[in-house]
Every structure is written in structure tokens, then in C-alpha cells.
């Protein structure tokens, strides 16, 4: 395979030579001589097309781009477009005075063996740099960094158009920044030519105005950009949080709340800030680099090409040495850790060392590790010096080369002294901008790659079925468990419910009792559609529970737990929580009276507008239960689930709840499931289910179960027995 690749590369080289050598006269004879620039571009584009097809064939044979082969495509582009680009800039710089002989001379010069070789030598580092920049945006995992960046910017919606305005202001600001180098060159020419003072003063004022305008445009650009990115931050936070809320209940069992919260808040904020900050710098320095490049070509296309050819050598070689220095620094740290380990082992086992009289042996061992580290330290220091020296010398050589070549152009009258001064200032800023861009690309890739954390939640499909569509206007509230089995997602092998079958009838109170761990609270969770049965069916009015619309179902089914959670809001907001309408104050007060919450709420100075604190921590357990019961009653549910919801209530409020369940006018249309360990509540229930190991062990009324003398009676007697 390697031999075929080298043979194909040699054939491409030969084709390139033949294209430039024997085919030139034929191509030139077919083109209009009055448009010399057209000839150059036709040859360049033809060369690019032919060589590009050849490269595609080579990459196809090798099943993709690997190693140096990946640089073939940018190499072909650099070779093919270099001369047309040079001819175009010469045309622009000469204001249309490029002659036919100039274009022909460029092409025939490039077909000479020495020039042909020089063009390849010059294009190779440029292609390597091109490939390096391209690899920074290579696909990471299953996503492409560019696609992820576009998706992040997609959160801007219509406001994404503001970025075009930002780019325009940015370019104008960068152009304004060019005033100082430009006028510095002009002032240099005036000083050398003894120009009058008014011209000098006028141009100083013009330079100042352009600089101030550039600063104002930069300020406006930054302001619009930051406001736009702030909109993106808020939108991303909202969408991520909404995506989390869509997940099934099992998702929150597998993932700790702290981890989810960190992902929604801190990780999302860090990713958004990192992307917006890095993108801002990237756009700014890219705009500067492009503006500087235009002014450099305008000043001297020849010196600009010299600068571009040397850029790869200026940055790639120090980068390579930097990797060597970094690897040596890692080895030094590893060597230091080993020497530290030797000392730690000796000191922690000092009695053993002394009992074997091996103090000198441990000292020699430690010294050996230090010698190894010393050798690595020397290599690291040399690599660091080489990196710094190479960076300094390569930059200095480029500056000296530009000054030398520019001086030759000044001597020949091709450019003025002022133009050379301006070009040097442009070139210094341009190399700095390119250096910053090269350092920003990895940062940008890392920032965009971190957005995978966000997309992991945004793209996650909930395991629970989608919301159904049933929303009948008349519902009875008949609940049927038919051979229901269930295991929690985080413990799929542990069956909590097994073959559970029972019916809850409208207008009745059914008490569900049993020992801890028998599955009582799981029944309540299934009735709220927080989980779906792993076996059997759960029906509401003859229809599977998952077929009901999500919002409709939870207006008909309400639950109160033993330790209900309230939100850090007012009593009024907590009672009205989740309603799709705004209840009147009379409705809120009425349900608060029913639940026994009205009396203590009225005792607060701000009444129903009093904040209850985070998770209701300013209230007692009984007060939280009373507010939660009011929150359930205001929905006027057909199915009310009380999961030990009165355990913390005082005697008066418990009596109030009993009246609510058994004497309220609404009880005839309400199905109640009462999960409790309180005998006073269970005894009055119309029907009692005794749950044992996930299935119904006994059922009947209180008197029937007591006469039967089974597990229910044993539990009642155990609870009634005095404590020893």
C-alpha cells in the first residue's frame, strides 16, 4: 500500500510538471491576449482541478486521509492558487497596468525546474499549516465542532442577525485601527520630503479622529455582541432546564440532584461564557488579521507573500519544540514523584530500615532518583531554551528579512520609505494576530466540545412514554390494578410489586396498610404516573393510565406525602402551584380552611403572602402537611392519594381531615386512597387492603379483617400493645 501511495504521488508531480511545461502554449493560444490575468487564472484553476481529482483518487485508495496524506489537498490548493493570487494583487497594486508579458512570465518562470522546486518547498509548510488549522475542527466523537458551534448559535433565533451587524462594526473598527500605521508611513514620507506643517497637522487630526471612531465602533460592537450572547445564555439555560424537567422519574433516581443542578447551572454557564468569550476574541483577531493582510498586500504584495511563506516556519517549529518541552516537563514531574515516594517509604518504615541497618541504602536509592531527575531537568531546560530561542530567532529573522527586502525595494523605487515603515508595523501586528488565532483555535474547540454536556440533556429522549391525548369531560375515578408488577429503574432486579390486583371505587375511601417496604408508596407513585408498571395494567376508568394527557391527568389525580416539599414562595403561590388558572382568594381560603391551614396562615403578619422559606423550612411538619393538603384539594381531584399525609397533624386537624374524607359533600364523587399507619383513620375506611411483599395479602373492612385473625389483626394488636 505504501509503495502505491508513493507511486501515485510521483505521478501527480509529473502531471503537474507536464501541465505547466508542454501544455502552456496550447492553453495560451486559446485565450484572449487582451486579458492577461484571465490566462493566469485559467491555468491555476485547471491545475487545481486536475491535481485535485488525482488527490481524491489517492485518498480513496488509502481509505481516507492519514498522516501526511491529509495535507495533499491544501498543498494542491496552495500550489494552484499562489500564482493567480500573486498576479491578481500585482494587478491591483499596479492599478491595471499588468502586461501580457508579465502574466506569461509568471507562468513560464514557475515551469523552470528551479522555480518548480522552490514553489513546492514554499507551499509545503503553508499546506502543513493549513492542515493543522483544519485538524483543530476535526470531528470529536460523534459530533463536529463546527456543527455544535452552529447549534449553540442557533439558540439566538432571530437575534442571530445581530452578529452580522457585529461583524460589520468589527471590520470598520479594525479598519480604523489601521490609521496609525498608515499615517505613520505618510508622516515618515513628509518628514523625508520636508512637507509643510499644515499637511502634517491635518493628518494628525485625521488619524486621531479615525482612532477615536475605531474605539467607538469597537465599544458598540462589544455592547451588541455581549447583549446578544446574554440572550443565548438565557435561552440555553431555559432549554436545558426544560429538557431536564421532561425526563422520566427514574432519571432522577440514577442521577443525583446535585449533579443535575450543577449541569444545568454551572456547566451550562461555563460553556456559554467560554464559547462567547473565545468566539469574541476569535472574531476580533480574525478581523484584524484580514484587515492587516489587505493593507499589507496593498503596500507590497511581494513582501506580503514573503511573510505568508515564512509564517509556518515562524509558528510550527516553536510549537513542535514546545511539545518536546512539555513532554520532558511531565517526565520531570514523574521523576520527582518517584523520588518523593522513595523518601516517603523510608520515613514511614523507619523501624524496618533501622532493623536492617539500611540507612545508607535508602540514601543511595534517593540519590539515584535525584540524579535521574537532574538529568531530565537539564534536558527540559535545554528544550525550553531551544523553544524560546527558536521563537525569538525566527521572529527576528523574519523582521530582518522584511527590512532587507523592503530596503531593496525602496532603493529601486518600488515602494517609498513611508510605505515600508507602514508595512513593518502591519506585519508585526499581523504575526501577533495569527499567533493569537492559533492559540485560540484549540480553546475554541475545547469550549465547543464541552457543549456536549449540554446536548447530552437536550438530546436525551425520556424513557417514559409520551403524554397521551385522553381528556374526557366526565370521569368517574374507577381505578383498577390488574396483575401489576414493578421494579425501580435503578434496581431492576428487585421486584417491589408482584401480581398486584385490586380496585378503587368512586365515592369510597380505601386504606392501604402493611409493613414498611411492602410497596405502599410505590402504589401511590404508579397512580401519579411517575413510573409505569413493568408488568400488568393500571387502568383509570377502563383506560390505561399512560393514555391520558399529562396535564389533564394531574388535574384529576392529586397526592399528599408524609414529608411534602413546598417551594420558597408565598402560601398563596404554594397552594395554587401547578394550576393552569389563577384561583380566587376565596377558593384559596376555602381549601386552607378544609385542610386546617387557614388558622396558622392568618397568624402571620403578611398572611397568605408570607414566604414559607426554602422547601418550607420555616414551617413545622404538620403545617407543611396542611398546606400540601390544601394544594391538592384546590385541584378538586377525582382521585385523592394521602400517603401518611396526616402523621404530623395535631388531633384537631386530624379530626378535620376525617370529616373531610367521610362527611364532606364532595366525598361521593371522590376516590380516596389512604396510606396510613394510624388505626383511627384505617378503621373508618370503607375498604382495607393489607399489602405484604408487593401483593395484597388480605382485604376487607376493619371488622372483617379483625375477625379473620390474620396479618392485619396482628399488626393492629402490635400497634395497640403498650411499649415495654
From Swiss-Prot:
The protein's enzyme class: translocase
Query: For the ABC transmembrane type-1 domain, which residue ranges apply?
Result: 163-446
* Enzyme Commission number(s) from the entry: 7.4.2.14
Catalytic activity as recorded in UniProt: a peptide antigen(in) + ATP + H2O = a peptide antigen(out) + ADP + phosphate + H(+)
Recorded topology in the membrane: Multi-pass membrane protein
Q: Which Pfam families match?
A: ABC_membrane, ABC_tran
Which InterPro entries does this entry report, sorted A to Z?
AAA+_ATPase, ABC1_TM_dom, ABC1_TM_sf, ABC_Tap-like, ABC_transporter-like_ATP-bd, ABC_transporter-like_CS, P-loop_NTPase, Type_1_exporter
Residue ranges in the Lumenal topological domain are 33-36, 90-109, 184-203, 296-304, 416-419
- Give the site residues for Inter-subunit salt bridge with TAPBP: 16
GO molecular function terms attached to this record: ABC-type peptide antigen transporter activity; ADP binding; ATP binding; ATP hydrolysis activity; metal ion binding; MHC class I protein binding; MHC class Ib protein binding; peptide antigen binding
Q: Which residues lie on this side of the membrane: Cytoplasmic?
A: 1-11, 60-68, 131-162, 225-274, 326-394, 441-724
Q: Which GO terms describe its cellular component?
A: centriolar satellite; mitochondrion; phagocytic vesicle membrane; TAP complex
Q: Name the family the entry cites.
A: Belongs to the ABC transporter superfamily. ABCB family. MHC peptide exporter (TC 3.A.1.209) subfamily.
Entry's free-text remark on domains: The peptide-binding site is shared between the cytoplasmic loops of TAP1 and TAP2.
Query: What is the protein's given name?
Result: Antigen peptide transporter 1
Amino acid at each position: 500500500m505504501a509503495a502505491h501511495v508513493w507511486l501515485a504521488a510521483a505521478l501527480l508531480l509529473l502531471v503537474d510538471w507536464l501541465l505547466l511545461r508542454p501544455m502552456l502554449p496550447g492553453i495560451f493560444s486559446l485565450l484572449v491576449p487582451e486579458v492577461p490575468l484571465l490566462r493566469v487564472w485559467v491555468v491555476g484553476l485547471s491545475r487545481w482541478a486536475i491535481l485535485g481529482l488525482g488527490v481524491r483518487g489517492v485518498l480513496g485508495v488509502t481509505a481516507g486521509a492519514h498522516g501526511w496524506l491529509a495535507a495533499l489537498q491544501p498543498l494542491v490548493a496552495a500550489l494552484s492558487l499562489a500564482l493567480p493570487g500573486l498576479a491578481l494583487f500585482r494587478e491591483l497594486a499596479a492599478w491595471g497596468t499588468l502586461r501580457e508579458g508579465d502574466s506569461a512570465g509568471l507562468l513560464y518562470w514557475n515551469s523552470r525546474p528551479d522555480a518548480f522546486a522552490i514553489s513546492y518547498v514554499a507551499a509545503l509548510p503553508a499546506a502543513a499549516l493549513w492542515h493543522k488549522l483544519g485538524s483543530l475542527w476535526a470531528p470529536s466523537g460523534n459530533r463536529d465542532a463546527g456543527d455544535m458551534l452552529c447549534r449553540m448559535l442557533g439558540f439566538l433565533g432571530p437575534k442571530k442577525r445581530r452578529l452580522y451587524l457585529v461583524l460589520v462594526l468589527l471590520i470598520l473598527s479594525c479598519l480604523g485601527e489601521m490609521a496609525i500605521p498608515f499615517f505613520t508611513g505618510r508622516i515618515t514620507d513628509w518628514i523625508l520630503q520636508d512637507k509643510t506643517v499644515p499637511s502634517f497637522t491635518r493628518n494628525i487630526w485625521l488619524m486621531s479622529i479615525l482612532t477615536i471612531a475605531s474605539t467607538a465602533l469597537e465599544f458598540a460592537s462589544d455592547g451588541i455582541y455581549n447583549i446578544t450572547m446574554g440572550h443565548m445564555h438565557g435561552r440555553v439555560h431555559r432549554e436545558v432546564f426544560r429538557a431536564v424537567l421532561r425526563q422520566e422519574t427514574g432519571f432522577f433516581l440514577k442521577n443525583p440532584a446535585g449533579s443535575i443542578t450543577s449541569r444545568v447551572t454551572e456547566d451550562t454557564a461555563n460553556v456559554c461564557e467560554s464559547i462567547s468569550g473565545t468566539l469574541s476574541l476569535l472574531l476580533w483577531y480574525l478581523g484584524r488579521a484580514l484587515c492587516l493582510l489587505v493593507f499589507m498586500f496593498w503596500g507590497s504584495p511581494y513582501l506580503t507573500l514573503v511573510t505568508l511563506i515564512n509564517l509556518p516556519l515562524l509558528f510550527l517549529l516553536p510549537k513542535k519544540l514546545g511539545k518536546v518541552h512539555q513532554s520532558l516537563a511531565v517526565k520531570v514531574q514523574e521523576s520527582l514523584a518517584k523520588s518523593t515516594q522513595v523518601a516517603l517509604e523510608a520515613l514511614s518504615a523507619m523501624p524496618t530500615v533501622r532493623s536492617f541497618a539500611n540507612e545508607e541504602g535508602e540514601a543511595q536509592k534517593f540519590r539515584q532518583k535525584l540524579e535521574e531527575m537532574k538529568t531530565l531537568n537539564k534536558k527540559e531546560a535545554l528544550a525550553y531554551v531551544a523553544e524560546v530561542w527558536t521563537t525569538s530567532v525566527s521572529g527576528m529573522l523574519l523582521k530582518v528579512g522584511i527590512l532587507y527586502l523592503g530596503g531593496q525595494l525602496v532603493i529601486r523605487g518600488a515602494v517609498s520609505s513611508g510605505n515600508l515603515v507602514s508595512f513593518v508595523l502591519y506585519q508585526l501586528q499581523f504575526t501577533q494576530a495569527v499567533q493569537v488565532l492559533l492559540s485560540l483555535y484549540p480553546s475554541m474547540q475545547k469550549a465547543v466540545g464541552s457543549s456536549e454536556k449540554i446536548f447530552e440533556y437536550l438530546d436525551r429522549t425520556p424513557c417514559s412514554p409520551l403524554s397521551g391525548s385522553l381528556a374526557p369531560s366526565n370521569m368517574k375515578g374507577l381505578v383498577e390494578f390488574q396483575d401489576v408488577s414493578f421494579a425501580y429503574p435503578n434496581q431492576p432486579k428487585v421486584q417491589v410489586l408482584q401480581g398486584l390486583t385490586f380496585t378503587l371505587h368512586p365515592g369510597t375511601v380505601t386504606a392501604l396498610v402493611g409493613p414498611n417496604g411492602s410497596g405502599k408508596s410505590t402504589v401511590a407513585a404508579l397512580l401519579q404516573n411517575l413510573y409505569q408498571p413493568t408488568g400488568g395494567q393500571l387502568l383509570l376508568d377502563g383506560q390505561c393510565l399512560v393514555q391520558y394527557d399529562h396535564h389533564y391527568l394531574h388535574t384529576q389525580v392529586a397526592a399528599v406525602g408524609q414529608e411534602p416539599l413546598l417551594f420558597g414562595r408565598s402560601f398563596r403561590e404554594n397552594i395554587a402551584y401547578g394550576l393552569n388558572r389563577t384561583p380566587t382568594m376565596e377558593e384559596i381560603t376555602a381549601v386552607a380552611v378544609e385542610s386546617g391551614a387557614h388558622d396558622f396562615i392568618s397568624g402571620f403578619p403578611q398572611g397568605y403572602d408570607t414566604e414559607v422559606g426554602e422547601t418550607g423550612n420555616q414551617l413545622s411538619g404538620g403545617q407543611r402537611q396542611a398546606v400540601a393538603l390544601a394544594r391538592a384539594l384546590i385541584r378538586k381531584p377525582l382521585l385523592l392519594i394521602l400517603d401518611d399525609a396526616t402523621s404530623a397533624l395535631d388531633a384537631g386537624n386530624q379530626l378535620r381531615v376525617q370529616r373531610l374524607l367521610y362527611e364532606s359533600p364532595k366525598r361521593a364523587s371522590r376516590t380516596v386512597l389512604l396510606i396510613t399507619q394510624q388505626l383511627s383513620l384505617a378503621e373508618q375506611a370503607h375498604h382495607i387492603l393489607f399489602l405484604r411483599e408487593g401483593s395484597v395479602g388480605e382485604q376487607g373492612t376493619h371488622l372483617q379483617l379483625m375477625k379473620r385473625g390474620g396479618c392485619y389483626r396482628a399488626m393492629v394488636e402490635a400497634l395497640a400493645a403498650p411499649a415495654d
